[in-house]
Structures are given as structure tokens and as C-alpha cells.
């Protein structure tokens, strides 16, 4: 189901799905919103992503001198699967391409597009929605909470002493360079094998692989042909890959090249150890930069001197989550401790509001149902979304006065039920 046409909140501005013929106008509005020049290759990229009913535009019918309404705000969504604790794929609505031209701000256009899309997502059966926020303070009012951060590292290779010797690796393994064709052919299957192991991960559509292979252009995406390496075990099974670039930089007669890790997938710890050891052994490299790792990543602990690893400047919140169907979402994930907790949830849209009892069992299953029992915790749906994937801390939210503890110790109990040993991580923008 798409999004039905509807008059926008500002008189003379109509919010509706765009037609295929309006792609160029929609992309022009998006470029203005992101403060980039509009160029034809961007429209080619939108062609790959076009899905009837899922690209919304706000059209100004009163544009001076225009022979047709002009697009002044953009919004796109698509369906994907979000890996939740335990490995299940939760059906979610992924939101992207959200802009409002600076000439049309404060007119309710974002609110109109967002509420239309979220309502349609609930009807389609999406249990949650996700997005990446350009600014921290925009999306909380729509029920989104920061659920998956990024935490990268910048490592001085000489000071680090490299990766420690003796780390476990697969006996007889090998690492080989791969062509772009091999990357595009074998990478998708490897990613699909890895994705169920990592809460917070999402699918990579065909367009994602084509973009990373340099087959299509996208303004704002700084594609540079890098190096792809595959890791195989002794029997030839592909268990990992890394994609990286190396900048040609010298300090006089001495190489001072930074190596930037753009993609890293390992199905097990042995594969990861071997790939990191390889990356830290590349000739002429002075710094290894890994900007898009997950929180608590072990990279510094793999080094002879962990102090050589400095937090990357892009470390920040990344994926935001908005719960739409609490029973479906909480039944899909797994839990690491049994227990019961009653939550009083507020939701401006009313979709998830009410008193809910979360019950988890020793076998890892759980459910959430309506109840009239007294609440242990009071919180809004955005804060619940930040806890859902197992990476947030209810105790920290309580200390920051971002939720209300009605029963002493309830925040710690919430962490016992909801937090997971494996932190959520999503390496992919969308």
C-alpha cells in the first residue's frame, strides 16, 4: 500500500506521492534541501529506487511564474528487515530523503509527510520505523529514539605495535584481493549470512551493491575505487571481507598513508582477527581509520598498545527507531533473563500508548500485553525505542530524568530484561 493523496497543512501546498515523471523535480527539491547542486546522475540513482507510492513530495501550487506545482519538500521510505536480538528480521519502514526547502520551513510539511508515512507503515504491517537523523532534535517529537550508535576508531599503526600475535585464526586460512565484479557477486550472500548475527543490521538492496561498485553515481556519496579482500577458510568457505581505501600521503621521503576501512564483515572472531591483522600490515600505512564500527568494538584490545586507538570524530548516534506495533516488536526479539515489568507508555500519536506488561521467559522468549496493573516505569515511545534493540540503558535514562521510575529499582530491572551482551550495530547508511 502506498500513501494516498492529501492536502498539506499549508494552504496551497499538496502532500502526495510523486509520479515517475516527477522524479527530476523531486530530486531537484532534495538537492536544494541538502544544499547540493542538482545534477542528472542523481536522477539516474532515483530511478533505481523509485517505488510507486513511497516517494512523497510537497507541491506548492502558488509558485510565481510556474506552469505547474513545484516540489518543495521530499520524503522517501522503503520496506526492509531489521535484525533484532535473537536473529529475527523485524519488518520495518526505513525513512530517508527527508528535506524541506529553506523557503518553506515552519509550515508543517515534515509533520504532514511523517505522519502520513508512519500511518501507512502501520497499515502495511511494519512493526517499527527507522531513520538516520541529520540533527539530534528533529525526530524525537515523532516518537523516534536513538537506538544504534556508531563508534569508530583512528589508530596510529606505529604506536599501536600492530595486532597482537597469537590471536586465534582459522588454520590454513587465506586472504585474497577481489575484483569489483567478485565483490558484487559474492558480497551479497556473505552479508545475508552475517546479518542474522548482528542486531541492528538491515538489508542491502541491489542498488547498494551497485553504488559501492561504482556502477552508478550519486552526488554527495564520495565513491573512490578501493581494495576488496576476501577471507576464506582452508576448505574454501568465504567467511569475511573488507573494503578499504588508501590515500597517497607522504611526509617528505616517508610514507604517511591513512587506510580507511569502509566495509568489514566477519562471520566469526577468527576471521575478524585475520582481517584486522592484514589491514594493519599493509605497506606504507601510518594510520588505520575505521569510522563505522559498533559501540564496544574490540579493535583497541586487539592491539599491542590500545592507547594508540583514538575515538573517531564521527562517533555519534546513528540509527533512530520508532516503535509502531509493540506486541509484534517485543515478540520478535529474544531476552537474556526472565522477568516481568509494567510500562506506562506515552505516544503523541496514540499508536503505542497505554499500560503494558513485558514478560520474558527463561527460554529467551517474551511478550508484551495490555494490563491494568500499576506501572513500574513511565516513559515515552521514543525512550522505549532507544532501549528496544538492547543497547540503551534505562538506568542512565532514569538518572537523566528521561523516564520515571514508579517502583524503586525498576530501571535496573528493565536493563536486565532488555539489554544484550551483543550491542546493536548498523554499519549502513540509507
Regions found by a protein language model. Name each.
Residues 58, 77, 100, 231, ...:
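GNAT/GCN5-related N-acetyltransferase fold signature
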Residues 63-74, 93, 236-241, 259:
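Glycine-rich phosphate/pyrophosphate-binding loop shared by adenosine-nucleotide-utilizing enzymes
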Residues 95-122, 268-280:
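Conserved acetyl-CoA-binding loop-helix of GNAT-fold acetyltransferases
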Residues 123-127, 133-153, 294-311:
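Conserved active-site alpha-helix within GNAT-family acetyltransferase domains
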